[in-house]
């Protein structure tokens, strides 16, 4: 049986089966994000066996399709309820479920990574040039991302988390590290929207911002993850240097409903 799910405890205990695979699911249970979520569940003898999340808090919705042996069945059951266009994170092979109704723009294979802790020499290192960013700087931050990371998932409400750090030189933002998900209640965070201005790359600014962000998160959060494209070698080196290890691979794409005339 397929039905929408709103029971936070049920969703949480299901998602704990693989905390880093379902990191967004867990973090989005926080009241800060939950009102933007639609959860589709597959039940077998009243037991939740599969779960798909549609997050509508961004300009373009994002669908998260990860699961187990019956996830394809659940996806087929809900496909007529999905938006006309959305980003999708999914297990390899599930793209075929969309192709009869949607056009696909494939973004490639990505890697989920999990945090094991900063190396000892970085745990207490401080960077005077890296500061916390606030909502007062929204305009400058949006301008920075438009130039440096136009495909970012950043929305200004994310600054309310207090987990965005940046380097500013001559009144211009040069680098930012932030979060996609952050919940003290559910003890989880997912790093994201990490970028550096083209003119400042190779100077270690992203590393500085990521370390500063992790130092802040370590005091509050037990489980920290991130997503990165598998062929982004520079980013992979940065994350490995700052305490992340691979967890599993998945795919990303943009889907747009086919138009028939």
Each PLM stretch: what is its role?
Residues 1-23, 117-152:
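Short amphipathic alpha-helix that is part of the acyltransferase structural core
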Residues 26-79, 177-192:
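Conserved donor-binding loop and adjoining core beta-sheet/short helix segment
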Residues 55-125, 253:
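Acyl-donor-binding surface of acyltransferase catalytic domains
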Residues 69-81, 196, 202-218, 236-241:
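Conserved acetyl-CoA-binding loop-helix of GNAT-fold acetyltransferases
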Residues 89-96, 226-236, 252-261:
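Conserved beta-strand-loop-alpha-helix junction that forms the acyl-donor binding cleft
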Residues 93-107, 207, 230-248:
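Conserved active-site alpha-helix within GNAT-family acetyltransferase domains
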Residues 135-190, 195:
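A mid-sequence, solvent-exposed acidic-amphipathic segment
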């Amino acid at each position: 049986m397929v039905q929408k799910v709103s029971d936070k405890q049920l969703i949480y205990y299901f998602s704990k089966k693989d905390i880093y695979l379902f990191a967004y699911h867990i973090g989005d249970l926080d009241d800060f994000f939950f009102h933007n979520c639609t959860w589709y569940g597959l039940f077998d003898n009243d037991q939740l066996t599969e779960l798909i999340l549609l997050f509508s808090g961004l300009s373009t919705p994002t669908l998260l399709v990860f699961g187990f042996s019956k996830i394809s069945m659940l996806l087929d059951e809900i496909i007529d309820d999905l938006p006309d266009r959305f980003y999708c994170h999914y297990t390899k092979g599930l793209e075929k479920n969309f192709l009869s109704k949607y056009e696909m723009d494939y973004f490639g294979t990505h890697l989920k990574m999990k945090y094991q802790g900063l190396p000892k020499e970085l745990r207490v290192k401080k960077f005077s040039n890296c500061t916390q960013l606030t909502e007062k700087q929204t305009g400058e931050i949006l301008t920075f991302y438009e130039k440096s990371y136009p495909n970012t998932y950043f929305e200004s409400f994310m600054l309310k988390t207090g987990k965005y750090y940046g380097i500013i030189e001559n009144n211009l933002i040069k680098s930012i590290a932030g979060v996609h998900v952050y919940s003290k209640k559910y003890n989880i965070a997912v790093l994201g929207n990490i970028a550096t201005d083209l003119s400042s790359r190779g100077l270690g600014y992203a590393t500085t911002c990521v370390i500063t962000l992790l130092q802040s998160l370590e005091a509050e959060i037990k489980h920290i993850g991130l997503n990165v494209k598998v062929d982004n070698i520079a980013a992979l080196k940065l994350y490995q240097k700052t305490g992340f290890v691979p967890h599993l691979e998945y795919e990303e794409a943009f889907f747009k409903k086919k138009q028939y005339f």
